[in-house]
């Protein structure tokens, strides 16, 4: 590293510690995400702006996520955009204090923190709503809303707002907006069987699955050997061959450091990697009407930004994985049809789940129609 780079790195570290040490952690994160920590002037300006915004605000929203700032480059979680949009759309009446990178936990822990009112807003998997609104788990039904467009159609539909949102709100949550990441993929470890193009290629493959009964059933139906492994233990399981394959989105594979231990990735589009920003309903309902409207508009703005970011985030993650030697495989309509025939939601094996989760086949049919009906939002598909 030459002298200039060393000086910049030293200045960046010094300014980060200075900001964090004076209690301006959000300012430190904002400047860091902008790549400006080396600039004393930029650091001072951002710290002052954050301090002024916090002091002028009438309400503070702690917004927690599992992802570091900058993750949106490959995993479009859009937390800095959401912070900025909420602050501006409420005319500064709300100050958003970010808690990124799992500082306050992740997944179910963040959902519980929002529900209990410990924090006001958090990003978590849509599946974390399932204990409170079982209908949500329909997203894990293969090919029901696996493509980006079907997922976006579904969660923005009147049917979803009528069937799902009231159950979520009855449990103390308000969904601010649903985040489109990309479908889950089939990713094979280095030293594994090779590319997976048809379900028969999964024969004998130990496929890492989460706790979801539906995902376990799906991978069994398409020929794999479902192997439950906790998320935190998954990298070592893949390295050691305890599991041969796994199914996050491409962006998640990159963000969580899998690039050097994978060989092939196939876009099967079965199930979405779906996230949501949820708020504590009681806190939200206690805000003045104009502030509520501002927050909701900020959610809509950030949703547009998220949908626009999906293809570029995927392209970056794919580029980085390719550098590590990973090969990608997109399937033709005929090839996808083989997967759908083998494990898709139209099969009778899924009927019990449809009734259990949707409440009735009529309600399921309503949600199915919503997923297949183009709504007002367009999104690029993998």
Question: Which residues does each predicted region cover?
Answer:
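N-terminal secretory/targeting leader peptides
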Residues: 2-151, 174-382
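Short beta-strand or tight-loop elements
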Residues: 171
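A gly/proline- and charged-residue-enriched helix-loop-helix capping module
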Residues: 150-161, 165
